[in-house]
Swiss-Prot record:
Name listed for the protein in its UniProt record: Peptidase T
Binding positions (Zn(2+) 1): 78, 141, 198
Family the entry assigns: Belongs to the peptidase M20B family.
Its biological purpose: Cleaves the N-terminal amino acid of tripeptides.
Compartments where located: Cytoplasm
Pfam families registered for this protein in UniProt: M20_dimer, Peptidase_M20
Taxonomic lineage: Bacteria, Bacillati, Bacillota, Clostridia, Lachnospirales
Co-factor remark: Binds 2 Zn(2+) ions per subunit.
Length: 407
């Protein structure tokens, strides 16, 4: 078994799901367990300045082996998994030499992953894939990134003959709930530039991401006995449905791709008396992003005129912005990644992230930080999988980037 696979299978055994609407960082105590294990592993590998912060951030240094003036590079991945589906008791399975057909994830439950539903699955024919048993997500997002960074670190620490500058490693909590760098110590991290290893398909390089906002839409209804409700009842749940119908139908995650933004209704809580709808708003274009937020407010105003003031109230909070403007002055980061992939006969593909990464916010905190692939697909659900062959290649990509910066 390859080292990166062995590490990955170990890391996904840790239940590290983060939670929304929790004040502390980390949002769940279970993230500490993996953090402590990673801290101990880094120490055992011989990394220096290994430390864990009071907010569950793990940092480490691989000292430079060259006297040349070389930028200090950082590599960052996150420890938590998305709350979209449970990651407790993950039972990974390695499908050897995938034949290109359907993969039965759980025969008893009739859960099958098919290239008819997931066409990109076919691209992995002949590779070894790590899949779920259909009852949990896998955790490749971002434990594949952690395994790749850790395996890269082990290689550099056991091959001191390789010339490289100072390498900084950072593992973060709570990325999936938008708080991954709330307490990240950029100055103490000590990197001039960094990469997150939190992408998807092998060969992808990302330095554009969504502008993102979260919305908490509160609706105050009027509860009356339904037998005597004529002209009196305001059903908050139905009002929420009316609000949703006033948003553009085509600007929905299921109908968008590439640079197209969307409104996404993530969760509904409510009764006749009151309801709360939780939305996320996304767009790569800053102007369109602002327009989407304005439309949200306009719909609230319109419905308040119809149903009475203070029936609808929206709390809109920006989460992160498109890092493109912060990375473009340092395009050597993208160019080096391309060069590294080409040297390894991997075709680089620059694509926009239809999401966000810790790197997006780090870029606005003074640490330009594009995103690199991990080899995983179908994140945040039971059909998630990771290519073992791709993980091994990503380790090589990281090492090659480091070597290129030392030349």
């Amino acid at each position: 078994m390859s080292k990166v696979l062995e590490r990955f299978l170990n890391y996904v055994s840790f239940h590290t799901t983060s939670e929304d609407d929790q004040e502390p960082v980390p949002s769940t105590d279970r993230q500490w367990i993996l953090a402590k294990a990673l801290e101990q592993e880094l120490k055992a590998l011989g990394a220096t300045n290994v430390r864990m912060s009071e907010h569950c951030y793990v940092y480490a240094t691989i000292p430079a082996t060259t006297t040349k003036k070389v930028p200090a590079l950082g590599f960052v991945a996150h420890m938590d998994t998305a709350p979209a589906l449970t990651a407790e008791n993950v039972k990974p399975r390695v499908v050897k030499n995938y034949d290109g057909g359907d993969i039965v994830l759980n025969e008893a439950l009739g859960i099958v992953m098919s290239p008819k539903q997931f066409p990109r699955l076919k691209n992995n024919e002949g590779q070894d894939l790590v899949v779920t048993d259909g009852t949990t997500l896998l955790g490749g997002d971002d434990k594949a990134g952690i395994a790749e960074i850790m395996t890269m670190a082990e290689y550099l620490l056991t091959h001191p003959e390789i010339e490289h500058g100072t390498i900084q490693i950072g593992f973060t909590p709570d990325e999936e709930v938008g708080r991954g760098v709330d307490f990240f110590d950029v100055e103490g991290f000590g990197a001039d530039f960094a990469y997150t290893v939190d992408g998807s398909t092998l060969g992808e390089i990302e330095y554009e991401n969504f502008n993102a906002a979260g919305v908490k839409l509160k609706i105050q209804g009027t509860s009356i006995h339904p037998g005597y409700a004529k002209g009196k009842m305001k059903n908050a749940v139905l009002l929420g449905m009316e609000f949703q119908q006033m948003l553009p139908v085509s600007e929905n995650p299921a109908y968008t791709e590439g640079y197209e933004g969307f409104y996404h209704l993530d969760k509904i809580e409510g009764t006749v008396d009151s309801a709360t709808l939780y939305y996320i708003i996304r767009d790569h274009d800053k102007v369109k992003f602002e327009e989407k937020k304005k439309l949200f407010s306009k719909v609230c105003e319109f419905l308040n005129e119809k149903y009475g003031q203070d029936t609808f109230s929206a709390e809109i909070k920006d989460n992160y912005y498109n890092m493109k403007e912060k990375v473009e002055p340092h395009m050597h980061l993208v160019d080096r990644a391309k060069e590294a992939m080409e040297a390894l006969e991997i075709t680089p593909t620059v694509v926009p992230i239809r999401g966000g990464t810790d790197g997006a916010r780090l870029s606005f905190m003074g640490l330009p930080c594009p995103n690199l692939c991990t080899g995983g697909e179908n994140y945040h659900g039971r059909y998630e999988y990771v290519s073992v062959n791709a993980m091994e290649k990503v380790v090589e990509i990281l090492i090659k980037i480091i070597e290129l910066y030392a030349k």
